[in-house]
């Protein structure tokens, strides 16, 4: 009886270890939007955020200070009108990349 109980405990411990390894594997992977398991974008410096621009949804990292600029706020209004903010695509700016790069270079 004691042997069966010890064997059962060992199996339980092994199963827990396997489950722990499986769950930690998922944490190391990112999703298609380059986000970690908490939904935070990878490789984004503090004080910045990610936007996706144009038809090809090219990823740009921009400073948070842009949020106070009226020019950038217009882009956000366009994004809200076209996509809304309740979707799984990340913050998408509906303008051509050339226009976006030009605007952001002026804002810097």
Curated annotation (Swiss-Prot):
Induction: Induced by zeatin. Repressed by abscisic acid.
Domain of life: Eukaryota
Keywords: Cell membrane, Developmental protein, Growth regulation, Membrane
Gene Ontology, cellular component aspect: plasma membrane
Principal location class: membrane
GO biological process, one term: response to abscisic acid
Membrane topology, record value: Peripheral membrane protein
Keyword rRNA processing annotated: no
Cellular location(s): Cell membrane
Tissues expressing the protein: Expressed in organ primordia. Hardly observed in leaves.
Function (record text): Provide a mechanistic link between auxin and plasma membrane H(+)-ATPases (PM H(+)-ATPases, e.g. AHA1 and AHA2), and triggers PM H(+)-ATPases activity by promoting phosphorylation of their C-terminal autoinhibitory domain as a result of PP2C-D subfamily of type 2C phosphatases inhibition, thus leading to the acidification of the apoplast and the facilitation of solutes and water uptake to drive cell expansion. Triggers plant growth probably by promoting cell elongation. Regulates branch angles and bending.
Matching PANTHER family: SAUR-LIKE AUXIN-RESPONSIVE PROTEIN FAMILY-RELATED
Family per record: Belongs to the ARG7 family.
Protein's recorded name: Protein SMALL AUXIN UP-REGULATED RNA 51
Annotated source species: Arabidopsis thaliana
